[in-house]
């Protein structure tokens, strides 16, 4: 059944979306024939920006689901404190998840994360607990560390 199908978009950056970057808005757009659940994979490091992007995605793009990406291992992303580096800072992770869940209202939010940065810094248990505590609908574990890449 189509109601059970979920296709998550490419990852978009909350800041670029809020700032109105055309390329990011194109990634977040859906065709008229795309009636299956509209799901966006969202990335960012600032709770307020992520909350604003969530509101805009729901109100302007008709998004039915937000998937937060805390698993990106790309050095450019993790070096700036994003992606797989966020769960290393559990208070920030909690603030981000809380702000997005609150902004999403009845729209479901899920989170994706890795085991950790490397085998000496595993964060997945805390990340899962934070997600559960903040009301995400589901968590997804990419069962590799950021150091293992893809």
Language model segments and positions:
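Glycine-rich, positively charged N-terminal anion/phosphate-binding segment
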Residues: 1-60
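Alpha/beta enzyme core
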Residues: 48-82, 86, 90-150
């Amino acid at each position: 059944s189509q109601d059970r199908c979920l296709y998550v978009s490419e990852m978009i950056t909350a800041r670029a979306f809020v700032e109105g970057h055309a390329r990011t808005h194109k990634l977040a757009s859906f065709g008229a024939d795309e009636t299956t659940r509209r799901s966006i994979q969202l990335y960012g490091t600032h709770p307020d920006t992520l909350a604003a992007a969530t509101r805009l995605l729901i109100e302007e793009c008709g998004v039915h689901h937000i998937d937060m990406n805390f698993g990106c291992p790309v050095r450019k992303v993790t070096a700036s404190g994003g992606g797989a580096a966020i769960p290393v800072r559990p208070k920030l992770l909690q603030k981000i998840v809380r702000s997005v869940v609150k902004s999403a209202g009845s729209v479901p939010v899920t989170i994706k994360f890795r085991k950790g940065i490397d085998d000496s810094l595993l964060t997945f248990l805390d990340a899962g607990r934070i997600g559960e505590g903040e009301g995400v609908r589901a968590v997804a574990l990419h069962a590799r560390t950021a150091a293992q890449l893809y």
